[in-house]
Design a protein with these regions (language model features):
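Extended catalytic core of nucleotide-activated donor transferases of GT-like folds
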Residues: 9, 15, 23-27, 37-154
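Histidine-centered beta-alpha loop that forms part of the nucleotide-sugar donor binding/catalytic region
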Residues: 8, 96, 119-123, 167-168, ...
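A short, glycine- and acidic-residue-rich donor-binding loop in the catalytic cores
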Residues: 268-280
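Acidic donor-binding loop of glycosyltransferase active sites
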Residues: 89, 253-270, 286-287
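Short hydrophobic beta-strand element within catalytic cores of glycosyltransferases
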Residues: 280-290
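Carbohydrate-associated surface elements
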Residues: 149, 166-169
Length: 290
């Protein structure tokens, strides 16, 4: 069947973890014989930051690794939904989409026969419910929530009539053990700074132990402020900046262990909803400290 997905970006995973899971989903559906069309905004901030820092080469690399990921980039003002959704049997709109797009697709669904689902993989329903209430899901057939807590909130607050749990998982085509690579260091951690949502946790569970145990350690990620980079350097931890997600299996293979350092909102308000990183590490057979 023809499936249409609207998301922030599949081309860029710069500070954008949703791309990890969705790339795998698109690949899986395509290889099962479905036709998948992906739409992402031309001005997606993740992609803009990626290109500004690293140029176009990473985008070509993503297409090589994920040949089925070939999104159509659109401008919201000129997006023709009749054309975009022609022949669709299923339409999925990801939560990192503009409320205007969510509402327009919902209005289009009112006069169409496809199934329409809203996909939520973020903590805003707990930490910023006012923002989530802006999404008009009146004509949506249901919500795909990445954990039971989120699913229950949609139902309790009557944001949606139906909601289902759909946990994220690693793409085992890309995330697999690389037995031919020998470890070069003790610890690797792949993750972004986190908008001050896990500053204390990073010091307690990553930076401090690496310093106190004298571990050879490397960190990949973006948006690390100067004080964070200074703390890493003082602890003897090598900071290497952004790492394309499809290269993470290689980084995992070159280390003996990694750690899971969740953001505070997930620990405090979203029990049972780990981010995708632990699954990616375990899929690569890397020991994981939680």
């Amino acid at each position: 069947m023809r499936i249409v997905l609207f998301c922030h970006s599949l081309l860029s995973d710069w500070n954008h973890g949703n791309a990890h899971f969705l790339r795998g989903v698109v690949t899986e559906l395509t290889e099962r014989g479905h036709e998948v069309r992906v739409f992402e905004p031309r001005d997606a901030w993740s992609l803009q930051n990626l290109v500004a820092d690293h140029g176009e080469a990473p985008l070509r690399e993503v297409r090589d690794v994920y040949p089925h990921v070939d999104p159509i980039r659109y401008d919201l003002a000129s997006l023709d939904l009749d054309e975009a959704l022609e022949g669709a049997a299923l339409v999925i709109v990801h939560e990192w989409s503009e409320p205007e797009l969510v509402a327009r697709v919902g209005a289009h669904r009112a006069g169409a026969s496809y199934r329409l689902l809203f996909h939520d993989t973020h903590h805003r329903s707990v930490t910023d419910p006012g923002a989530m209430a802006r999404y008009d899901l009146t004509h949506y057939d249901g919500v795909l929530a990445f954990g039971r807590v989120i699913r229950d909130l949609y139902l309790e607050r009557r944001w949606a009539r139906r909601a289902f749990v759909w946990h994220e998982a690693a793409d085992a085509r890309v995330f697999r053990p690389r037995r031919e690579i020998q470890p070069e260091r003790d610890l690797v951690w792949v993750g972004n700074w986190g908008d001050e949502e896990r500053t204390r946790e990073l010091d307690e569970f990553l930076i401090g132990p690496a310093r106190d145990l004298g571990l050879s350690a490397r960190v990949h990620g973006v948006r690390y402020p100067e004080h964070a980079r200074a703390a890493l350097e003082a602890a003897g931890v090598e900071y290497r900046g952004w790492l394309p997600n499809h290269r993470a299996p290689d980084a995992f293979a070159r280390a003996r262990v990694t750690v899971h350092v969740p953001r505070r909102p997930y620990v405090a308000s979203l029990p049972g909803i780990p981010t995708i990183r632990p699954f990616e590490a375990m899929a690569c057979a890397l020991p994981l400290v939680c």
